[in-house]
A protein has these predicted regions:
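Short beta-strand/loop motif that positions the catalytic acidic residue
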Residues: 30-32, 37-39, 58
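Conserved strand-to-helix beginnings and helix N-cap segments that scaffold or border functional pockets
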Residues: 18-22, 48-49, 69-70
Length: 85
């Protein structure tokens, strides 16, 4: 049984060589358990919107999430504590 989903730098829209980017938002929208998405403020793959059961936290940096690893870790730790599963 899946209790929750953690997405670190979820690739919402992969850059393509031609044509419009294909969104993967439907994949996130299909998740029914609590979900945390941690995304860099300059992530070239896009930033998904928050939704029911989905928290989106923006941290400094890009898709690599390397600029502020402490912020990423603290965000995840706080979310896990709040879940209490």
């Amino acid at each position: 049984r899946v209790a929750a989903v953690l997405c670190l730098a979820f690739p919402l829209e992969a850059p393509r060589r031609s044509g419009p980017p294909r969104s993967r938002l439907d994949e996130l929208d299909a998740v029914t358990v609590p979900t945390l998405v941690v995304q860099g403020e300059r992530d070239r793959f896009g930033i998904p919107p928050p939704a029911t059961n989905r928290r989106v936290t923006i941290v400094p940096g890009d898709h690599g999430l390397k600029k502020d690893v402490t912020a990423v870790a603290q965000t995840v730790a706080n979310w896990l504590r709040d879940l209490a599963i």
